[in-house]
């Protein structure tokens, strides 16, 4: 049995799809791509879910150069097994999920061809049914059952649909209903930076029909080489790009999406970036206005100031693990198992999901929620700046990714964390955080640091926050002495 497990990246499949200047070998070839299609068919058969007969599957791509070829290879397999394929062309990851929800599509499943913000020569697949995105164990099953299938052969057809137009109409209807206004953005100057990914539609298909002036929007054209900057709301160059555009054109707001539009961030009129903790704070304020005393789930590296902000707005902050699917699934679990509801689960990366939207991480939907509130606040004179004014910002925050050179890196890293916990207790005013869900979180005299094992790489990831200048350096000096005892730990990155 051939295994393709090396292509698994958590709940996604990712690989090299194009020849590249780094001479990295192609791993998403025709044979491996079509084997993945077979694996998905086997997963469908194993699930024994009640799909339509014949089954309908929608497939879309982001702007990557290899997307059309991969789609063609997948389609060839699915059609040969009697599965009707809806080719939706350029799409976003959230829109692909919605194709399983929209009654006019009735897709039993959907595949998004994307590799998020990775370099142009990568690509990959995300899978959905109406129940949501496939989990890690589902992807493992697909890749382990990709050789042959007993699924009956058949003959089917391909149709083409404009999913982005239908998805845009869905968002426009949502915004107009919530604001009770046909042109709720009239008088607002809003710039979009799509980074040449799939998010350029947001200008002409959503903002303009709602009355916004979008002069100065940039990099809207799909270009899989991403020639201007990486489409990534966490990337400094990308955030600087949209920030500069906002101030240059004297806009009221800037919006930036990642490649497949499941993440987003915004920029205020003065160029101030609202991503990471600020983005979470803004959406928490909006959510808690609608759902007081509800739970906000975040990942583990959010700031202490954010926790205070959520509490001050009447919410319960549940700081969980890194990994957007971990965060979203925790929100779902809380709703299933407790009497304290969760309406927002969001990671500092910009992946955020709302209960009202199928707990789907959808950057465009999150921006739509912000636009709805912006329209309402405008009438009462309230601004985003005022909403965020009470968010305490740390004086310093840093992340270090420390390579582990040991072949059994997870065991080695686990031992380091255990030893560190014992070591740190010998230092005055340092203590282990009482409530923590991953790695080791240490409370320091000026803030905290969290050290954890990377989800996918041989790394220790160290996040640090201090409320005073120089606090991180003092914490690092303590860590230098400790790390010096571990020869397979490359602590040069800390210097």
Indicate residue ranges for each PLM-predicted region.
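An N-terminal, well-structured beta->alpha segment
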Residues: 1-74, 80-81, 157-187
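A short, gly/pro- and small-residue-rich
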Residues: 120-145, 267-283, 357-368
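Proline/glycine-rich low-complexity loops and linkers
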Residues: 79, 88-93, 143-173, 183, ...
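Gly/Ser/Thr-enriched, mixed-charge loops and adjacent short helices
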Residues: 121-246
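Short glycine-rich phosphate-binding loop at a beta-alpha junction
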Residues: 51-62, 189-191, 294-300, 343
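Phosphate-binding and adjacent anionic-ligand microenvironments
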Residues: 292-463, 468-495
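N-terminal small/polar loop signature for handling phosphorylated ligands or for N-terminal nucleophile
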Residues: 42, 46, 50, 55-122, ...
């Amino acid at each position: 049995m051939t295994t393709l497990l090396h292509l698994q990246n958590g709940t996604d499949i990712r690989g090299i799809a194009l020849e590249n200047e780094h001479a990295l070998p192609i791993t998403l070839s025709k044979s491996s791509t079509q084997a993945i299609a077979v694996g998905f068919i086997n997963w469908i058969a194993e699930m024994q879910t009640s799909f339509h007969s014949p089954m309908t599957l929608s497939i879309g791509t982001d702007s990557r150069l290899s997307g059309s070829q991969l789609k063609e290879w997948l389609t060839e397999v699915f059609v040969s097994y009697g599965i009707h394929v809806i080719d939706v062309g350029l799409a976003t990851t959230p829109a692909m999920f919605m194709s399983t929800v929209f009654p006019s599509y009735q897709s039993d499943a959907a595949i998004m061809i994307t590799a998020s913000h990775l370099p142009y020569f990568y690509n990959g697949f995300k899978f959905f049914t109406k129940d949501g995105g496939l989990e890690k164990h589902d992807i493992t099953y697909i890749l382990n059952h990709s050789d042959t299938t007993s699924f009956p052969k058949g003959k089917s057809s391909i149709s083409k649909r404009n999913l982005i137009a239908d998805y845009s109409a869905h968002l426009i209807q949502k915004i107009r209903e919530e604001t009770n206004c046909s042109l709720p953005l009239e008088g607002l100057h809003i710039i979009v930076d799509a980074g040449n990914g799939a998010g350029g539609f947001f200008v002409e298909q959503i903002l303009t029909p709602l009355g916004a002036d979008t002069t100065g929007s940039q990099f809207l054209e799909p270009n899989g080489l991403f020639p201007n900057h990486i489409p990534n709301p966490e990337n400094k160059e990308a955030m600087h790009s949209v920030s500069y555009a906002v101030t240059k054109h004297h806009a009221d707001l800037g919006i930036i999406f990642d490649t497949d539009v499941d993440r987003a961030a915004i920029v205020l009129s003065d160029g101030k970036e609202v991503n990471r903790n600020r983005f979470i704070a803004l959406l928490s304020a909006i959510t808690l206005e609608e759902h007081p005393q509800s739970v906000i789930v975040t990942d583990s590296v959010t700031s202490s100031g954010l926790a205070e902000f959520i509490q001050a707005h009447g919410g319960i902050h549940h700081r969980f693990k890194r990994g957007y699917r971990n965060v979203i699934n925790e929100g779902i679990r809380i709703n299933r198992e407790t009497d304290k509801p969760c309406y927002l689960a969001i990671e500092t990366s910009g992946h955020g999901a709302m209960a009202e939207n199928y707990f789907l991480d959808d950057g465009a939907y999150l921006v739509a929620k912000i636009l709805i509130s912006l329209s309402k606040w405008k009438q009462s004179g309230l601004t985003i700046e005022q909403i965020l004014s009470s968010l305490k910002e740390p004086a310093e925050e840093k992340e270090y990714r420390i390579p582990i050179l040991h072949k059994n890196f997870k065991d080695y890293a686990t031992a380091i964390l255990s030893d560190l916990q014992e070591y740190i207790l010998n230092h005055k005013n340092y203590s282990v955080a009482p409530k923590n869900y991953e790695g080791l979180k240490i409370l320091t005299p000026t803030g905290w640091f969290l050290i954890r094992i990377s989800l996918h790489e041989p790394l220790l990831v160290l996040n640090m926050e201090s409320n005073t200048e120089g606090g991180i350096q003092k914490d690092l000096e303590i860590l230098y002495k400790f790390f010096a005892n571990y020869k397979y730990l490359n602590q040069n990155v800390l210097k």
